[in-house]
Amino acid sequence: MLIRHAPDLTDNDVTDHSLYLKRRTLMAGVAGLGVAGASASHAQAGLTFSRGFSTTEKPTSKEDITTYNNFYEFGVDKSDPAENSGKFKPRPWTVRIDGACEAPRTVGIEDLIGKNKLEERIYRMRCVEGWSMVIPWVGFPLKDLLASVKPTSKAKFVAFETVMRPSEMPGQAWNTLDWPYREGLRIDEAMHPLTLMAVGLYGDVLPNQNGAPLRLVVPWKYGFKGIKSIVRISLVEKQPVTSWNVLAPREYGFYSNVNPAVDHPRWSQATERRIGEFRRRETLAFNGYGEWVADMYRSMDLKRFY
């Protein structure tokens, strides 16, 4: 795998040698899982790092990121995903990409990792519950994957689906949600360069409790939009059904952009608690990514289309 510099990066955007070596652990970890194409020579290629999209805020500790999670397929408590995901098998793994496109295909996770240019991006993550983290993800832009299947003019939205494995995901035995978990984006949101398909964090492979082996990261939206353990991506003409919106449409809108001016019916969204900090901080519109994404919603009433 040739890990190339992203076209918008300069020499100053690429990490120094110590971080370059640190990021080799991702490919080494992939190789240890038996992923084809992740040899030592590939690991030496390193990863690119885009300062243009990454926040300079201090990342949340890896311990907090991997032990304080919402992943209802493994249970509803924050500690359940880490405690109950040990039996989950993220390899082998394939993802079906279909719908309104000219070249639908099924692709293995090894090909997704081996044939896409991986980047580390440090993103803020804001949960709809009023807490937040800063997470150093490793992944590739979703737009690159979608472009490979050649979307047609009928592709107005993108629908995502999580794997259904009750034997490995004990939370799916309960009717907490209408399983499998489903999410969706508008096509322009999906094609936005900020939208990431994550395969790792902190320079290592993605842990089970964080959505292994492949999850969506949309940093200007509330965290539940970041669907985990994805097995299907469909380009569709109509707005897709999404799990939390079906359960409680007044509380969880399809768009779910981070908006401190639009409260959840049961709590304020004006402030948030950063995990690892004591004091609450003000929540930023679009989670601080407004300069890149606000234009997509300029003509919309964000209180109506929440």
Curated annotation (Swiss-Prot):
Annotated compartments: Periplasm
GO cellular component labels: periplasmic space
Cofactor binding note of this UniProt entry: Binds 1 Mo-molybdopterin (Mo-MPT) cofactor per subunit.
Post-translational modification comment from the UniProt entry: Predicted to be exported by the Tat system. The position of the signal peptide cleavage has not been experimentally proven.
Gene3D superfamilies, sorted: Oxidoreductase, molybdopterin-binding domain
Cofactor (UniProt): Mo-molybdopterin
Primary location group: periplasm
Signal peptide location: 1-45
GO annotation terms (biological process): protein repair
Alphabetically ordered keywords of this record: Metal-binding, Molybdenum, Oxidoreductase, Periplasm, Signal
GO molecular function: metal ion binding; molybdopterin cofactor binding; oxidoreductase activity, acting on a sulfur group of donors, quinone or similar compound as acceptor
PANTHER family: PROTEIN-METHIONINE-SULFOXIDE REDUCTASE (PTHR43032), PROTEIN-METHIONINE-SULFOXIDE REDUCTASE CATALYTIC SUBUNIT MSRP (PTHR43032:SF3)
Annotated family: Belongs to the MsrP family.
Official protein name in the record: Protein-methionine-sulfoxide reductase catalytic subunit MsrP
Protein's organism: Caulobacter vibrioides (strain ATCC 19089 / CIP 103742 / CB 15) (Caulobacter crescentus)
